[in-house]
């Protein structure tokens, strides 16, 4: 039986996430929560058979138990996530946070998803689009040899940056920098985001620079990065290396691009697509652990 889910936020990310959850073998999107009764996201959700409310999380709370909602995705804003999380936690709902609020531990699926399941976290943070794209590369390098400093530059199309993204720019840089260190393994991390107004819009591009201790092991680092890219491609097929890794002294540079699947968002919105795909991937693994727990025979 599929695990019932609610999506909080009916904007670009929430609507694209709904499309991905509808394909999931273990997740069932049951609710879409918004605040604008006329939003396109709520209209699409109703057409897809989901229950909807435009009264925010408060409109969902009375129905959580009756509809068996076990997992909620918060695709709203860092500024309201704390309150949403408090209300959902009181109802025993697992929260996947797609905002930069970072109340719970970071989750970058190919790097530390198993750790998050093992530590019993009830709120996990999906970092940022830049974090999901670049932290795996930093981690791949640091698995080979220590990284003293890592700097990432995420360039996204202005068209793919909605009001939520623009409002959370400062949180984006802080949260991504922390994830580079805490998940990627760099001693010091820095993140930069660039909104590119070019027309036609360009797909997401990311640059990852790592300064390693000692002379870089070219072969081992290249193989580690290639393995990590293959892991990300399992849930983001449009994730690929554009150039690199290249080596200049102790600096290792990798140039990436991320093309979206085009579920609800245009193909150039790879920055949003990698967030929804990573969140769906994480939730599927959590759902499987919930199913395993419920299927396990009771012991005296």
UniProtKB/Swiss-Prot annotation:
Active site positions: 129
One Pfam family cited in the UniProt record for this chain: AcetDehyd-dimer
Binding of NAD(+), residues: 10-13, 160-168, 271
Keyword Oxidoreductase assigned: yes
Disulfide bond sites: none
Keywords: Aromatic hydrocarbons catabolism, NAD, Oxidoreductase
GO molecular function annotation: acetaldehyde dehydrogenase (acetylating) activity; NAD binding
Alphabetized InterPro entries for the sequence: Acetaldehyde_dehydrogenase, Acetylaldehyde_DH_C, NAD(P)-bd_dom_sf, Semialdehyde_DH_NAD-bd
SMART domains: Semialdhyde_dh (SM00859)
CDD domains: ALDH_C
Example of a GO biological process term: catabolic process
Reaction catalysis annotation: acetaldehyde + NAD(+) + CoA = acetyl-CoA + NADH + H(+)
This enzyme's EC code(s): 1.2.1.10
Classification via HAMAP family: Ac_ald_DH_ac
Family to which this protein belongs: Belongs to the acetaldehyde dehydrogenase family.
Protein name: Acetaldehyde dehydrogenase
Organism: Alkalilimnicola ehrlichii (strain ATCC BAA-1101 / DSM 17681 / MLHE-1)
């Amino acid at each position: 039986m599929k695990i019932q889910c609610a999506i909080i936020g009916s904007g670009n990310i929430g609507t694209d996430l709904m499309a991905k959850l509808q394909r999931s073998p273990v997740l069932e999107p049951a609710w879409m929560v918004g605040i604008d009764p006329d939003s396109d996201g709520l209209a699409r959700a109703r057409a897809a058979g989901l229950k909807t409310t435009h009264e925010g999380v408060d409109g969902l709370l009375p129905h959580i138990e009756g509809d068996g909602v076990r997992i909620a995705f918060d695709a709203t804003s860092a500024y309201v996530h704390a309150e949403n999380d408090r209300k959902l936690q009181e109802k025993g709902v697992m929260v996947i946070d797609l905002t930069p609020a970072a109340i719970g531990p970071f989750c970058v699926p190919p790097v530390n998803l198993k750790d998050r399941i093992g530590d019993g976290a009830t709120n996990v943070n999906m970092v940022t689009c830049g974090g999901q794209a670049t932290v795996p590369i930093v981690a791949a390098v640091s698995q080979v040899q220590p990284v003293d400093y890592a700097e990432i530059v995420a360039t996204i199309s202005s068209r793919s940056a909605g009001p939520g993204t623009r409002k959370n720019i400062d949180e984006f840089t802080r949260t991504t920098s922390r994830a580079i260190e805490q998940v990627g393994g760099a001693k010091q991390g820095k993140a930069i985001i660039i909104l590119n107004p070019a027309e036609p819009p360009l797909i997401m591009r990311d640059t990852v620079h790592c300064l390693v201790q000692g002379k870089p092991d070219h072969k081992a680092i290249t193989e580690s990065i290639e393995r990590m890219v293959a892991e990300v491609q399992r849930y983001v097929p449009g994730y690929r290396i554009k150039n690199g890794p290249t080596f200049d002294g102790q600096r290792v540079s990798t140039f990436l691009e991320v093309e979206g699947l085009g579920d609800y968002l245009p193909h150039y919105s790879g920055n949003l697509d990698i967030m929804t795909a990573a969140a769906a991937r994480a939730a599927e693994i959590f759902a499987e652990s919930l199913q395993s727990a419920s299927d396990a025979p009771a012991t005296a």
